[in-house]
């Protein structure tokens, strides 16, 4: 049987995650932002490509054939027909491909240091007692990360399709090797990649959801769960919940694209949050690493931190000012289309100011959690994330940055880890890694997992 086919038991109570409100079927028309449908459906064999991958770089952005934003609704059928009430076994997996992982982990094999490193390296471990904050005295708990360790690693190259990437499978193999040297056991690591020969180990939408069920099953305080996704990401228009409220300050939900997204749809951030965060008990750690476009808030964690270690808030005036600057530059160069676009962007920012503030507060009210969830993502919600080649190996820029920092000096704080990853990427890429959390955190505490 495949991961996730079982009920969760926390404190003697059984919980069965309901997925009915998330129905993202195939699109009925062309997707937003000019992405047309691909020339054909994904191949059925999911075998290796007939030749070496091309040498140019792509971003981990919306694949062609993505779904129309105004056609997604939080309603409808259950996601999958299986009953989650049986046992659970991790899928059998073939031996690793020798051709894809010969260089080893980034940051090892004598690679040079990446330059200036932030932080003194003297960091306190997170407190083990219950924490509280806010006027309602909301409680949460850091994880000691000394319980069971489990990991789910998802890498999708979209082999043989128009959306093909080169780095995700390598990223998964590299992260797996990293985790094996940090207390994780191979029997507690599940990999889903599209070069697998085992059907249940292929990263389809249902397999990913089932594997997430396995990851969170029987989670307990001080367990350490690790989720890594490398592949395409995108956005879709935020839809109101049953009370008519929105939780995205920019008006868009973030999504990830399974291998079969064209037929079975994407996976939206609300669903990821409900499965990976809401189900966890206080003191259980979920460390999520997203190497995909538009991934800044893809786990819907309401507390986002800057490289100064302070909470970020929506900056509508800054966005409006950027639109006015674009309009002025377009006027100077005689670009009438650019003038209109810049002014429209500025007006839209002002109009969205009220909704943005309300959505941000509503997100904190509904998405704050007592567990210890942390998300490290490759870029802001409005940015793309690079699929690149570093040291002769195809890799995602974010996966590379995380592994390089942690391999060269695993004694990091939340803040120094974020700063050092940005340092690695800023010389070649415009993307800015993001740090979000399920509760307020002290960014100067030691990053453990």
Curated annotation (Swiss-Prot):
EC number(s) reported in the record: 3.4.22.-
Q: Under the cellular component aspect of Gene Ontology, which terms does the record hold?
A: cytoplasm
Keywords of the record, alphabetical order, are:
Apoptosis, Hydrolase, Protease, Thiol protease, Zymogen
Give start-end positions of Polar residues composition bias: 56-66, 119-132
Q: Where is the composition biased (Low complexity)?
A: 10-26, 67-91, 98-112
Please state what class of enzyme this protein is: hydrolase
The annotated regions of Pro residues compositional bias extend over 27-55
What's an example GO BP annotation here? Answer: proteolysis
> Which terms does the record give in the GO molecular function aspect?
cysteine-type endopeptidase activity
- Renumbered to this chain, region (Disordered) spans 1-132
What Gene3D superfamilies does UniProt report for this protein, alphabetically?
3.40.50.12660
* UniProt cross-references to InterPro entries, sorted A to Z: Caspase-like_dom_sf, Metacaspase, Pept_C14_caspase
Where's the active site on this chain? 232, 293
Q: Which domain of life is it from?
A: Eukaryota
Which regions form coiled coils? Answer: none
**Which family is this sequence assigned to?**
Belongs to the peptidase C14B family.
Q: State the function annotated in the UniProt record.
A: Involved in cell death (apoptosis).
Q: What is this protein called?
A: Metacaspase-1
Quick one: which gene encodes this? MCA1
């Amino acid at each position: 049987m495949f991961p996730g086919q079982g009920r969760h038991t926390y404190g003697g109570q059984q919980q069965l995650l309901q997925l009915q409100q998330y129905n993202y079927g195939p699109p009925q028309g062309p997707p937003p932002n000019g992405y047309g449908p691909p020339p054909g459906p994904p191949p059925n064999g999911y075998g290796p490509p007939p030749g070496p991958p091309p040498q140019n770089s792509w971003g981990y952005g919306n694949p062609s054939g993505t779904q129309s934003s105004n056609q997604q609704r939080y309603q409808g059928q259950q996601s999958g027909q299986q009953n989650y009430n049986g046992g659970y076994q991790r899928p059998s997996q073939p031996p690793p491909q020798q051709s894809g992982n010969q260089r080893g982990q980034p940051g090892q094999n004598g690679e040079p240091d990446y330059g200036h490193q932030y932080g003194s390296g003297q960091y306190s471990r997170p407190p083990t007692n219950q924490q509280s904050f806010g006027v309602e005295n909301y409680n949460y708990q850091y994880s000691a990360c000394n319980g069971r360790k489990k990991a789910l690693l998802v890498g999708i190259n979209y082999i043989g399709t128009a959306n093909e990437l080169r780095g995700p499978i390598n990223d998964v193999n590299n992260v797996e090797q990293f985790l094996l040297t940090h207390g994780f056991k191979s029997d507690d690591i599940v990999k889903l990649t599209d070069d697998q020969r085992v059907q249940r180990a292929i990263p389809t939408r249902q397999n990913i959801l089932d594997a997430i069920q396995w990851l969170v099953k029987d989670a307990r305080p001080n367990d350490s769960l690790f989720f890594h996704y490398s592949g395409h990401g995108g956005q879709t228009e935020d839809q109101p919940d049953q009370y008519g409220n929105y939780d995205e300050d920019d008006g868009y939900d973030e999504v990830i694209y399974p291998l079969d997204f064209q037929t079975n749809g994407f996976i939206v951030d609300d669903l990821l949050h409900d499965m990976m965060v809401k189900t966890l008990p206080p003191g259980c750690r979920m460390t999520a690493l997203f190497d995909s476009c538009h991934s800044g808030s893809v786990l819907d964690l309401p507390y986002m931190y800057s490289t100064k270690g302070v909470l970020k808030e929506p900056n509508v005036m800054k966005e409006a000012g950027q639109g006015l600057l674009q309009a002025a530059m377009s006027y100077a160069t005689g670009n009438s289309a650019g003038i209109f676009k810049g002014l429209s962007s500025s007006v839209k920012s002002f109009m969205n100011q009220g909704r943005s503030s309300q959505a941000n507060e509503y997100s904190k009210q509904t998405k704050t959690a007592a567990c210890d969830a942390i998300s490290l993502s490759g870029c802001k919600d409005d940015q793309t994330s690079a699929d690149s080649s570093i040291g002769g190996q195809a890799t995602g820029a974010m996966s590379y940055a995380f592994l390089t920092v942690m391999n060269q000096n695993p004694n990091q704080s939340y803040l120094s880890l974020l700063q050092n990853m940005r340092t690695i990427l800023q010389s070649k890429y415009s993307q800015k890694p993001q740090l979000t959390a399920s509760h307020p955190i002290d960014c100067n505490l030691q990053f453990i997992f």
